[in-house]
């Protein structure tokens, strides 16, 4: 007996009822992004492995432990399923010279892959909305991206999402802070866990992001990066805060917010909630002014953020925001050979007029078909038998208005009657 094949652990099917919800969510996202002038870009889900090692950093959890990497058996090329979208987007911007003559505002929606332990809100295949800008160096674009998040939460009817901010300064400022951190943690080496000891001389900033309760007090007393920032970095950070205060967007400065990728500088931010358990970050990003040059392009200021689709959808549901399932306008019932041929012509004619039609297939009695019509959620049933087919007519029955009369109409008059009743129904609501 053959083994039943199942989806890979941590990689989930999105079934029709759920996928319809996702489509509604993605439509909202695209409309929101276009309202800020962002344009779509689509990149491959497979990229050269060196891209992520150079962009994300060799000494990061993603590169060390979480990437799905393999060697192409045909040509020996090292490839990786993308664990995040920014590196691939920057690669595309450089390869196609997109930022040479003008600023760019880009977005993408798609799958990412990380070999993590699957749990609520964390999957091995997950979906992200990524938003990236190129060519804008001031704090205004940082602030705009944060304000975009605030508007989206309002549009989605979400509350309880809090904004945390920090500044990572410039590389030379981080170098001074790094030296101070190493000295501090070496002086308290007996309090470090094994992960912190491993990171101490490679990426000590990441120690501050530890989830180990036993190290929280130690990290809270560690040297703070903001004390090492120069005048320009401080002015940039204050510029972001000023816009947020003017817009009435509350925030908390979190000196331990460092992000898990090496390419960030200056502003970093996260939107977090306590409604999703341990996986509380729903949106995160910041500036990465050195990444384009680091990957072979010309020096280009850049800023971006990403949102987890699964987490946002879970948050919408947690907040009681389940949308109504979409339903067809018409369920087309037919019986008889002539009626079946007429049904195809009628269905296509109604679709030509923008009416959504679910046409019955598979035969069955009028009674069984009408039962399916009622269960479909359709507003109307259009009924065609051989008698109606012979005279070019059809029966129109409302499935939602109790006591309404069943009308016999010429096929050519169906669309006008349906559209008129749909408009009347919308006005009553």
Curated annotation (Swiss-Prot):
Put simply, this protein is called Histidine--tRNA ligase
Cytoplasm among keywords: yes
Report the GO molecular function annotations: ATP binding; histidine-tRNA ligase activity
**Which reaction is this enzyme known to catalyze?**
tRNA(His) + L-histidine + ATP = L-histidyl-tRNA(His) + AMP + diphosphate + H(+)
InterPro entries this protein is in? Answer: aa-tRNA-synth_II, aa-tRNA-synth_II/BPL/LPL, Anticodon-bd, Anticodon-bd_dom_sf, His-tRNA-ligase, HisRS-like_core, HisRS/HisZ, HisRS_anticodon
For this protein, the parts annotated as crossing the membrane are: none
EC main group: ligase
Which gene does this sequence derive from? hisS
Under the heading PROSITE patterns, the entry gives: AA_TRNA_LIGASE_II (PS50862)
Its main localization is cytoplasm
GO cellular component term, pick one = cytoplasm
Annotated organism of origin: Dechloromonas aromatica (strain RCB)
GO BP of this protein: histidyl-tRNA aminoacylation
Q: Which Gene3D superfamilies match?
A: Anticodon-binding domain, Bira Bifunctional Protein, Domain 2
* Subunit-structure text: Homodimer.
Q: Which family does it belong to?
A: Belongs to the class-II aminoacyl-tRNA synthetase family.
Decide whether keyword Transferase is in the record.
no
Q: Which UniProt keywords apply?
A: Aminoacyl-tRNA synthetase, ATP-binding, Cytoplasm, Ligase, Nucleotide-binding, Protein biosynthesis
Q: What is its EC number?
A: 6.1.1.21
> Which compartment or compartments is the protein found in?
Cytoplasm
